[in-house]
């Protein structure tokens, strides 16, 4: 299994074919490619590769494009213009609204993602944005909405100071791990295939 973080490069097919050939030469049945995408409306060609919707980017893009959110887009546009004149505007997104977009997305042929919170302002300053954490109820609703999918990839890689935390903290204690445990225990029979 090989995951391509940015899968829209022109040499992709040649590269994947080469990797597949090498895998077969070394006794494997081939390679499985997972392509990472941020735009749920543009998953590219159906090339047999598995598509993964990276969060929070995918749901944030759905949220920003939704006609329901025109006021948010206008406010954000004004904020970006004012940022060029002075400083102080940072885009703050309601995690529950972002999760709602994720819940409403119904494509079952993709691997879904999960991100519990986001804040890349330490790295990007005013160019960054914040996504507030969802409520426990919204998290559970999202998990219920994707429970029939085979895989879930949790974005908790905090290498670039983007606030994607899953691990215990002084502020949240074990909250997110406890949410996952609670949901898993509630759905234990489905997960074990019983």
Protein language model annotation of sequence segments:
Residues 1-11, 83-93, 126-136, 162-171:
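The substrate-binding groove and active-site-proximal loops of carbohydrate-active enzymes
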Residues 5-7, 37-38, 115, 155-158:
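Short, well-ordered beta-to-alpha junction loops that form the rim of enzyme active sites
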Residues 6-23, 185:
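Extracellular zinc-dependent metalloprotease catalytic-domain scaffold
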Residues 13-20, 99-102, 143-147, 177-181:
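Generic structural signal for well-ordered alpha-helices
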Residues 18-132:
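Aromatic-lined glycan-binding groove of carbohydrate-active enzymes
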Residues 132-168, 187-192:
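Substrate-binding cleft of secreted/luminal carbohydrate-active enzymes
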Residues 176-194:
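Carbohydrate-binding surfaces of carbohydrate-active enzymes
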